[in-house]
Amino acid sequence: RRAAAPALPVASATFLTTFLDFSDTGVLDVFIDEAFVKLREMQFGQGGLMPGHDLAATFSFLRPNDLVWNYVVGNYLKGETPPPFDLLYWNSDSTNLPGPMYAWYLRNTYLENNLVKPGHARVCGVPVDLGRIDIPVYIYGSREDHIVPVTGAYASTRHLPGAKRFVMGASGHIAGVINPP
């Protein structure tokens, strides 16, 4: 029931639009390579913060027609006030990330996919083995997700030996989670 060191038992786990296996990251593959990760390690690897607004802008530009240009045309060119939209408000409330954690995450997940290699990823010095997580899991993927493609979310099922339920829903990364499937 444990992925690494002894811990309190957990009855089940839920993964909503989440990668465990980073072998199919969709369009993000275009942006994350060795040079990019080294740059981020130099910038943030020893301390500091990854500004949340930078990360939010990255995700917005993965769907520029919907999340950027639509507002440039409406707000800037036409002078229209956008209608209130709870999902976009929530999406704009970004969180800064600890720099060393962000640099570790890029290298160990997106670049090297170490989370699915038993013992290759270490958290607080403890090797992680997803194959030891033998609890029931619920995994949800959104069909139009631009951050975690549904095929990437589904790939997690190969690495968890316990009972699994995978649900594919409609919509995108955020809306798919909060709307019924």
Range-by-range predicted roles:
Residues H146-G152:
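Conserved alpha/beta-hydrolase "acid-adjacent" motif
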Residues R2-Y102:
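Alpha/beta-hydrolase-fold enzymes
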Residues A7-S12, P83-P84, V116-P118, G162-G169:
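Acidic/polar loop patches that form or flank catalytic/metal-binding clefts of enzymes
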Residues L106, L160-P181:
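Catalytic histidine neighborhood in serine/cysteine hydrolases
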Residues I133, I139-G141, D145:
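Short beta-strand/loop motif that positions the catalytic acidic residue
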Residues N91-V128, I135:
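Mobile cap/lid helix-loop segments that gate and shape the active-site cleft of serine hydrolases
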Residues A5, V10, L16, V27, ...:
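Gly/Pro-rich cap/lid or specificity-loop segments adjacent to the active site
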